[in-house]
Amino acid sequence: MFISNIFQKFFSFLFVLLITTLVCADPKKVAVIVPLEHDSMYKIVSGIQEALKDIDVEILVKNAHADPNILLAIINQIKDHDIDLIIPIGTTVSQTTISHIINKPIVCAAAIINGKNLPLVTGVNDEIKITDTISKLPFLENITLIYSSSEKVIPEVEMLKLYAKNNNISLYTAMIQNLNDMPIAVKNAPKNTQSFIILKDHLIVSGINILKQEAFVRRIPLIASDEGSVINGATIAVGVQEKQIGVEAGLMAKKILQGIAPKDIPFSDMKDFTLFINLKSFLKQDILTQENLSVLPFKHKEF
């Protein structure tokens, strides 16, 4: 009887200790790195938060404010702190994070990354080629592409140049180094241009107000590559709903935090594309018609 009581007390003690450990255990920490202030970033972060809401996790959101020096400072801070998982948003931020942090799992969101030989890295790709959109608007014969010097966009710039050459489209291009260059760049676009084109180019989309005002003056559309740009005034874009990118990345992060190795979670492509339309901006241009948009093979979302 005495021994039985001892065992009872011992197991009761173990049970209390286990419960106390579970209750007092520190939550996992996830660092989300956003490249700049933009509606699309807020939506992606919101999706990440939604996907992780039912597990004990602390989400730290760090904003690089489109500054490479701030980005490096954030990455170095994360590298030296008790962070369990990192979610960088965008190709440039993801590449920089991967090159500096080699001992923590990384889930890249809205990025094009070659995951070969990167066992701690996985992610979500949401890219759609701008040529896929332009090809469905064959009446556009004179277009202007505004882009930054970011290495990420150069392949798509070259792809658009080749597409324009092969399809007898007059393509005017203007590369800018910073937002101070943008007003002159858009003013210098040919008078006969039928549309401004922008990519998923963080510097350019942060200056969308400059672009849309010039587009309104010319009565031409501003064709973008993401939902957030349309919310902020671009006429149309074909892309994915930004929040869903975050949800997909968050679900990957959840699996990793629950014990699945990143190398066992393949990179995924977002395939459910949507045509985003800003109705106010649409009414301020004379090139695209409702009929043009109605034949595009995507579900529509209007703002």
From Swiss-Prot:
Cross-referenced Gene3D superfamilies: 3.40.50.2300
Entry-linked InterPro entries: ABC_transpt-TYRBP-like (IPR007487), Peripla_BP_I (IPR028082)
Name of this protein: Uncharacterized protein RP367
Species of provenance: Rickettsia prowazekii (strain Madrid E)
